[in-house]
A protein has these predicted regions:
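Short beta->alpha connector loops at strand-helix junctions that form conserved
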Residues: 81, 100-104
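Active-site phosphate-binding strand-loop segment of PLP-dependent enzymes
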Residues: 106-169
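Phosphate-binding glycine-rich loop
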Residues: 29-76, 90-94, 100, 123-133
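N-terminal "arm"/small-domain region of PLP-dependent enzymes with the aminotransferase-like
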Residues: 1-29
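Conserved coil-to-alpha-helix start sites within the AMP-binding
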Residues: 83-88
Length: 169
């Protein structure tokens, strides 16, 4: 007997096929077209920001986010221990160093351990979190919501504000 346990189950409830067919008919199935523009406009409105940029993958979105956070070679970025490599690769693209943070029972980053790391292994100099042992700047924390479980963003955002970290979600 063969049993298959899916990693995730697609959830299609509306006009997805209609929209995909329409995009194909218009010849826009990648980086442009009306649907991309509409997505960017709706996301900007939802987020209350002037502009957003749709990306072709989560990896490229994370890479652009690290650039926006001014992550430089030699900097550090906190990442969860349980994630796909695509969440860590962009850190290496910037020649930065990932700092792996353990997860809690939700399988997402543990804010208790994040706070303990910031308190015990780091210090703040001129509104910049510094890893005490290495002297390296910690510029950001990448939060990944795993398998439909939501990370405790309220706690993580509080920690990030206190320790001057940018949050990439």
């Amino acid at each position: 007997m063969s049993r298959f346990i899916p990693l995730s189950i697609p959830n299609f409830e509306g006009n997805e096929r209609k929209y995909v067919d329409d995009a194909i008919d218009q010849g826009w199935v990648s980086t442009g077209g009306a649907y991309i523009t509409k997505l960017e406009e709706q996301m900007a409105g939802f987020l209350h920001v002037e502009k957003v940029a749709a990306c072709q993958s989560g990896t490229s979105a994370l890479h652009l986010s690290l650039l926006e956070c001014n992550v430089q070679p030699g900097d550090m970025v906190i990442v969860p221990t349980l994630t796909f490599i695509a969440a860590v690769n962009p850190v290496h693209y910037q020649f930065a160093e990932p700092v792996f943070m353990d997860c809690d029972d939700s399988l997402c980053m543990d804010p208790v351990k994040l706070r303990k790391f910031c308190e015990k292994e780091c210090h703040v100099e001129q509104k910049q979190l510094i890893h005490t042992a290495s002297g390296k700047k910690i510029k950001a924390v990448i939060v990944v919501h795993v398998f439909g479980n939501l990370a405790d963003m309220e706690s993580i955002m509080d920690i990030a504000e206190e320790y001057h970290l940018k949050v990439i979600e």
